[in-house]
């Protein structure tokens, strides 16, 4: 059985755009998670999420692993981008859209063609 930290590392490694949040994109359980989802969704690319309310082990361990105390947490290409305030700020400056599009394009080109 893998440890919680190993599970977190695997989630981050396997999902180029990953949001740790309270609730789900369709039903966020806090305003900060809802704002982060709106900004991410507006970038027009798919992203993965982990509902920390359903994963108390991750909720307990991720702040220590990330050295970031709060949720949501956006991880892009293996790196912590930040929480709600940073995500919104980057979106307002146009930086989030660029980062998300570039990351999505990078990983799309690595996928084998479905045809």
Swiss-Prot record:
Primary location group: cytoplasm
GO BP term, example: cell redox homeostasis
One MF term in the entry's GO annotations: 2 iron, 2 sulfur cluster binding
Positions annotated to bind glutathione: 22, 59, 71, 84-85
Location of the protein in the cell: Cytoplasm
Assigned keywords, A-Z: 2Fe-2S, Cytoplasm, Iron, Iron-sulfur, Metal-binding, Redox-active center
UniProt cross-references to PROSITE patterns, sorted A to Z: GLUTAREDOXIN_2 (PS51354)
Family the UniProt entry places it in: Belongs to the glutaredoxin family. Monothiol subfamily.
The protein's name: Glutaredoxin 4
Organism in which the protein naturally occurs: Escherichia coli (strain K12)
Taxonomic path: Bacteria, Pseudomonadati, Pseudomonadota, Gammaproteobacteria, Enterobacterales
């Amino acid at each position: 059985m893998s440890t919680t930290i190993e599970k977190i590392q695997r989630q981050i490694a396997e999902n180029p755009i990953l949001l740790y949040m309270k609730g789900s994109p369709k039903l966020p359980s806090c305003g900060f998670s809802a704002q982060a989802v709106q900004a991410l969704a507006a970038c027009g690319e798919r992203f993965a999420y982990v509902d920390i309310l359903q994963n108390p082990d991750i909720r307990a361990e991720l702040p220590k692993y990330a050295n970031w105390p709060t949720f949501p947490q956006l991880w892009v290409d293996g790196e912590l981008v930040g929480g709600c305030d940073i995500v919104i700020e980057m979106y307002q400056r146009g930086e989030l859209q660029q980062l998300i599009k570039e990351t999505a394009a990078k990983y799309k080109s690595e996928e084998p063609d479905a045809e």
